Amino acid sequence: TAAYTSNFTPPTAPLTAVTNTKFLLNPETSISDLSQKSEIACFGDAATSTTQVKFAGTKSIYLDGTGDYLQISNVEDSWISGYTGDFTVELWWYPTNVSNGTYQEILTAGVGFQLYMSPAAGLSLVLSSNNTSSYFLDFWQEHTMTINTWQHLAVVRNGNVYTLYVDGVSKATTTSSSTFSSGTDPVQLGVYGGTLYPAVGYFQDLRITKGLARYTANFTPPTAELEG
C-alpha cells in the first residue's frame, strides 16, 4: 500500500516503521510511547538506566520492586483486550532477583492478562475471557528464567493459536477461539494492581503489535533496538 499518492505534509512526529505497531516503549530520551498512541505514567522511582542494556548505546528501564512500575493509559487502540485478530506482545527482561515476594508480574492487565514469573523462576501466562480467574489459557512454569540475563519474551496469537516464546523458542502453545478481556483495568509493567507481586530488574523494547502475528514459528530474537 502506498502511504503517499499526491502532495502531502511531511511527518511532524517520529515515524512508526510498521503500521501494526500500536505501542513501543523504547526509552532512549524519555519513558514514552514511540507510536504516540498511549500515555505512560511512572510510579515509585522507575527510571531509565544504562547499568544493564540489551544493545550497546541504548537505555533500559529499571524497576527495583519497591513501588516501581509503569502504567499505560489511553490504550483503546493499542491494547488487545477483546481483540479477535492476531497480535504480538513482546519485550526484553533482565530479572535480577528470583525471591522478591511470591510472584513477579512482568506485564499485566487486570486478571485477564498476566505474564509473570513464579517463585521458582518459572515463566507463566494466564488469559481470561471475562477478567476473572476462570482462565481459558494457563501456561504454568513453562520455562525457567535465568537471573541476570536478558531474555526475549513474546506472546503471540496467530488465528486461534496462542504461543509463548522465550528467546525465539516456543515454550507453550494451545488452540482456543476465546479472546481475553482485561475489562477497564490498566496495562501495567512490573506489577499487578499497582501494589502486588512487583518485578525486579531491567526492561527494554516493550512492543504491542495489533493485527499481525510477527512470529509464527521459532525465530531469532531482534538483534538491534526496535524502531517500529
Residue spans for each PLM region:
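Extracellular glycan-recognition modules
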Residues: 3-5, 66-127, 147, 161-162, ...
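Beta-strand-rich interaction surfaces with strong enrichment in secreted/lumenal proteins
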Residues: 76-78, 140-144, 176-177
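Localized edge beta-strand/strand-to-loop motifs within extracellular or lumenal beta-rich domains
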Residues: 149-163
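Extended recognition patches within non-cytosolic domains
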Residues: 1-39, 43, 48-59, 100-101, ...
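Extracellular beta-rich ligand/substrate-recognition surface
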Residues: 60-70, 127-136
